[in-house]
């Protein structure tokens, strides 16, 4: 989980590290500040599109190999950026690196579902969503100080590439295939024959092409087998977990393109639609704020250096940390309380956590725009930026936890859809940030705030009638209960 979260965080670093480099890149590449700011947008878009190849590749070669290939491409992208001699080369490096780095975002939710009991899913998911936001903080922070103290925008890319290479090495050694019921030739026979037949069905039986495609990697989201085996040697266990090849034991549907588009069937679920849009608009708001911070505070009367711009990103980091207790432990506490009182687990029991975020987030988003337009003190703008980011680990985390708990066998599909669409939304908003801001000023942030408020209001029916909505939408996507 730690390796995965770190990879996710570095993916956000790719998109967020441009603002402190903006002025040095303008001078070095001889292009406008608008084109340089769009490098962040293209990185965000390609991180999202990189999720698309996650499900098909996992179905064929498994999660471990998929993540290692993606991380290798992602790492090479940073070193390519550091050596780029033209704007076009720099853009190409960010596009290809983003396509490699995006795959891990889709696999985060499914690994959480595999590794943690349902009553701990929100807490574990808050670490994942924190990593999604933390990269947008540490990227500018490290970049700003590296540019100021080392004198070139190239050095941060070498630093990030080295960090990713180290993470790649650690993942090769310590990140196993995460499915929990691997059985191959030579295993001790389980004592219960019926349990053995279940395991063979989960791992060994070929899947029909028209069967639910999420189950092309069905073992990824099924509960672990209850069979108990004799302990084996650590070396043999590591070798099996490290070199287990899915294709030898599970036959995914032959239509690769169908595997690419199949996750988007989950969009018939209102909960997933709300989650996708809430994540996308919230991240778009914080990306737009980051871009405007680098432009506004680098000009008179502030005249901030790249290091000061990077240091300012501590504000959203504090917001992410503030949101975690609400979206993680707070949501789990509500779910556990409902379980104790009623004897059943109900994902909707955590949704009241959304109320404070439904009030605070739209107000803070609007006041960010007002603060930029009226020249408010940087500390005031930073406070509202922190509140906006608290929604990522708070309200957004509650929604993605709700989705994965309501459709546990669709965790990877939910991860793909959420990350693709949120990054496409983030790309669209951030790509047009400067032009939109020059035209509408604070009305830009008011529009974002109103959309966020409407999405929170749209979540109310899920709290009231969530179980019936979930049952209905499960039939639409062909969801089969255990």
Where are these regions (language model features)?
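C-terminal membrane-cytosol helix-exit motif in multi-pass small-molecule transporters
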Residues: 164-185, 331, 335, 459-463
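Juxtamembrane cytosolic amphipathic helices that cap and anchor the N-termini
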Residues: 1-3, 86, 250-282
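Extracytoplasmic
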Residues: 2-33, 49-50, 104, 108, ...
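C-terminal transmembrane bundle
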Residues: 8, 12, 41-48, 55, ...
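Intrinsically disordered, low-complexity terminal tails of fungal membrane proteins
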Residues: 1, 176-259, 335-346, 472-482
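Cytoplasmic helix-loop-helix junction between adjacent transmembrane helices
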Residues: 93-132
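Glycine-rich segments within core transmembrane alpha-helices of 12-TM secondary carriers
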Residues: 120-143, 147-148, 158-167, 171, ...
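Helix-breaking motifs and short loop linkers at transmembrane-helix boundaries and internal kinks
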Residues: 29-30, 53, 58-62, 83-89, ...
